Amino acid sequence: MKSPAPAHMWNLVLFLPSLLAVLPTTTAEKNGIDIYSLTVDSRVSSRFAHTVVTSRVVNRADAVQEATFQVELPRKAFITNFSMIIDGVTYPGVVKEKAEAQKQYSAAVGRGESAGIVKTTGRQTEKFEVSVNVAPGSKITFELIYQELLQRRLGMYELLLKVRPQQLVKHLQMDIYIFEPQGISILETESTFMTPELANALTTSQNKTKAHIRFKPTLSQQQKSQSEQDTVLNGDFIVRYDVNRSDSGGSIQIEEGYFVHHFAPENLPTMSKNVIFVIDKSGSMSGKKIQQTREALVKILKDLSPQDQFNLIEFSGEANQWKQSLVQATEENLNKAVNYASRIRAHGGTNINNAVLLAVELLDRSNQAELLPSKSVSLIILLTDGDPTVGETNPTIIQNNVREAINGQYSLFCLGFGFDVNYPFLEKMALDNGGLARRIYEDSDSALQLQDFYHEVANPLLSSVAFEYPSDAVEEVTRYKFQHHFKGSEMVVAGKLQDQGPDVLLAKVSGQMHMQNITFQTEASVAQQEKEFKSPKYIFHNFMERLWALLTIQQQLEQRISASGAELEALEAQVLNLSLKYNFVTPLTHMVVTKPEGQEQFQVAEKPVEVGDGMQRLPLAAQAHPFRPPVRGSKLMTVLKGSRSQIPRLGDAVRASRQYIPPGFPGPPGPPGFPAPPGPPGFPAPPGPPLASGSDFSLQPSYERMLSLPSVAAQYPADPHLVVTEKSKESTIPEESPNPDHPQVPTITLPLPGSSVDQLCVDILHSEKPMKLFVDPSQGLEVTGKYENTGFSWLEVTIQKPHLQVHATPERLVVTRGRKNTEYKWKKTLFSVLPGLKMTMNMMGLLQLSGPDKVTIGLLSLDDPQRGLMLLLNDTQHFSNNVKGELGQFYRDIVWEPPVEPDNTKRTVKVQGVDYLATRELKLSYQEGFPGAEISCWTVEI
C-alpha cells in the first residue's frame, strides 16, 4: 500500500452552551486537503439545541493525505451521531456499552493501532477526534450531530461558534434557527472576526416566536485582501437570547406525547441572604491568585444588599473568622470588610475541614439565637485551589463531616481555583449540600469568573420549590424539587404524558418567598401545544422526547456522584439503557468509529470524566500532555496526527507543589492590576424586546433592525466650576516625536455640531479624582474616567438601554451586559449587535459604541500604558440639551467671542457663565484611529 504523505490535520471544533465551532485548517495549495463545503445547522426549540456539522473535503494532492476531524463539545452536550462518507460508502459511528466497546478498543491496541480518540478539555469542553487517510482525488464527507439543553445563566441563553477554517471555503454557511413559543424577548449577536465586508454576509430575521441568523460569506468577503488568499475568519460568533415570561406558573410545551415545563419568575422580591465567604489563603494561592481573589471579593462585598447578613473566614493551616457572628451589610460594615479583605495574604497549608465546619458553626449559632431572618437563604461559598493538606485530609471524611454538620439546613457552593484542584471532591461536597461546584480557570479574567458566579446566586427569589402534576396525567417526570431559584436562572421539568391522560395538563408550583409562601398555577392544552410544533422549517421532530431523555441522563449522572451500593447500580443501569436507546455518548457508553479497510479499523469516543487530580481522564492510548484552557478568542492547540505519544500525567508531585506550570506554557498573562473605578449607583431593570415583532419574516441585515433608544430619566448634580488657565509651553502631554514642532495630542477633541469654529480641543491639566466627563439622561449615557499625567488610566462608559457598561484600561476591556462580565483584549476584532446599539473594535484598537440617534463613543488604546487611553466622539449632534459633565458642558449653548487681534490665535469662549481662554493650535487627532491626522483647533484647558 502506498505510504501516506506527511500528516495533515484540519480541525472542526464546536461548542454549544453555548455552541462553539473552531475550524482550523491549512490551505489546499500547501497540503492538498481542501474544504470545499462547510455548513453548521443549529436548531433550538424550547432551549433544546440540535446541531449538525457537515464538512466536505477533497484531496487535491498527488499523494495520500490524512485528514483529522475534531469537534469540541461542552461537558453537558451529548454526541448522538457521527458518520464519514468515503467514495460513496458510509462509515457510521456506533454507540455501544462501554465494556463491549472496550473489547474492540483493546484488540485494536493489541494490533498496534492507536484506537483512542484524542480528547483534551478547555473551559467546560471535551474534544472528539477522528482521522482518516484520503486518496488523491477522493472526497470525504464528515457529519456530526450533538444535542444539548441550553442553560439560562445571568438572564440569557448563549450559543457560541468559533470559526477558524484557515483557508478560503467556497461554500461556507452557518444557520441558527430559534423557535420559542413563549416569544423571544431579546436577541443579540457578537463576532470577534467580523469586518465591514463580512457584516454584509450576516442576516438576522425575527418575529414574535422565531429567529433565523445566517452567515454566508463569499470567497471575496473571506479574503484578508485582494492580493492575499488567507481568510479573515478567525474568531468567535455568538448568539444570545432570552424569552418572554409571565408571572404565572411558567410555560408548558408539549410535543409527541412528552412535555417540558420551564419556570423562571423574575418579578419577585429578592430574599435576604446569610452568606459566609470561606477563602483559602494557603501558600499555593500566593501571587496572581490571591490578588484576583481580593479584587473579586472587594467587588462582591460591595454588591451585598443592606438586608443581607455576612461574614468572612480566611483559612490556611487554621481558620480565622472576621467577626464573631454574622453582621448586617451596612455601609460601615461593608467598608470594614473591604479593608479586611484587601489585606488577606497567602501563606501556610490548607485546612478545608475546619474552615467549612467553622462556617456551619457560625450559621448554627445565629440560627439558635434567632438572628437569621425568617425565610432567608443561608449560603456558604468556599473558594480553594487544591487538596486539604492540614488537619483532616481524607476527602471522604471531610465530605461526611460537612454533610452531617449542614444537615440540609444551608447550601454549600464550592469554587475550585486552577487546573490542579481536586474538583470531584468539591463537586460531591457541594451536591451533597444543596449547592453546586464551579471551576475557576486561572487566567487574566479569574476575578471576573468569581464575580459572575456570585451574581448567579446573589438574588434568591424562591426556596423549597416543588412542581406538582395530576397523577393521572404524567409519568417518568425528571427532578421536580429544587432547593432554591435564583434570579437569572431557570428551573426545567420534563416528563411523559400518560396515554389516556386529560386534554389539559395542569401544573402547580409552590415555594417559599420573601416573608410568605406562594403557589403558582398554569395549564396547557395538549392539542393546541402539539399544533405549535408542526413547523418543519424550525423544528426537528420528536425533540421533546430526546430533551426528556437527555435531562434525565444528566440528572441521574449528577445523582450518581453521591450514590453508592444498590442505588449506584440502579442509576447506572438507567443511564445505560437510556444512552443506548437514544444513541447518546455518555460516561457509560462509547462510540466506535470504523474506517476503510487498510487503515486503523477502530477509534473509540468516550465521555471523559474528572478524576481525583482534577484532570480529565483520557483513553490510555490517547493521553496527551496537559492542556491549558484557552482564553476565549485565543487559538486552540493543534494536535498533529503523529504526536500521539503517551506522556505521563500530572500526579502527586504536581499537586504537592501547587504552583506547577506545565513546560511550554507560560503563566497566565495579564496586567499587574488596574485601578478600581467607583461602582455605578445601580442598573435599571433588564431591557424589553429589542426588535419589533410582526408577521413579516424576511431576511434583513442585522444592523438595519436596530432600534433607537428611548429617553432615560435621571438626576445628576450641577456642573462643577471649572478654572481655565493659559496653556503652558511645558505641557505634560507627550509629543508624537522628538521634534518640538510636531503637533501634540490633546486629551480630547470635541466635534461641535453646526459650529463656525474648526474644532474644539480640551486638555485636562490635573485630576485627583475620577471625573464625570459626560452625563446625558436623555441619551441614557454616562462617561467617567480618571486622568493621570498624560492620559486616562481608565474610562468607563455606561449605557442605560440596552443595559451595558464598558470599563477600559490600557491592558484590557471589561464589558458588563446585565450581570455578566466579559473580558476583551485590545486590537482584537469585535462586532456586536445589541438592541439599539452596535459595539465594534478594529485591529488598531479603536472600540466604538454607536446606534441610531445616538452619540458615537470611541475608546482608543495608545499602546503605551503611560499614555493611557483616548476618548473620541462622533455624531455629537445627538447630545440633548440636558447633557452635563466636565466635557458635556461644552455642548450646552456655548458662545464664542471674536478672535483677539493682531494674530487672531486667542479668543474667549463662554460656557455656562464661565469664560475660557481658547488658543488656536495644531494638534494630532485620532478621531479616525491610527496613524492620526493633523488638525487646527481651538484649545482650552480644564
UniProtKB/Swiss-Prot annotation:
Residues 1-28 form the signal peptide. This is Inter alpha-trypsin inhibitor, heavy chain 4. Residues 663-690 have a biased composition (Pro residues). Disulfide bonds join 761-937. GO terms for cellular component: collagen-containing extracellular matrix; cytoplasm; extracellular space; plasma membrane. Keywords: Acute phase, Coiled coil, Disulfide bond, Glycoprotein, Protease inhibitor, Secreted, Serine protease inhibitor, Signal. Pfam families: ITI_HC_C (PF06668), VIT (PF08487), VWA (PF00092). The gene is Itih4. Residues 552-586 form a coiled coil. Belongs to the ITIH family. May be O-glycosylated. N-glycosylated. Glycans are attached at residues 81, 517, 577, 732, 874. InterPro entries: ITI_HC_C (IPR010600), ITIH (IPR050934), VIT (IPR013694), VWF_A (IPR002035), vWFA_dom_sf (IPR036465). GO terms for biological process: acute-phase response; hyaluronan metabolic process; response to cytokine. Residues 658-698, 726-745 are annotated as: Disordered.
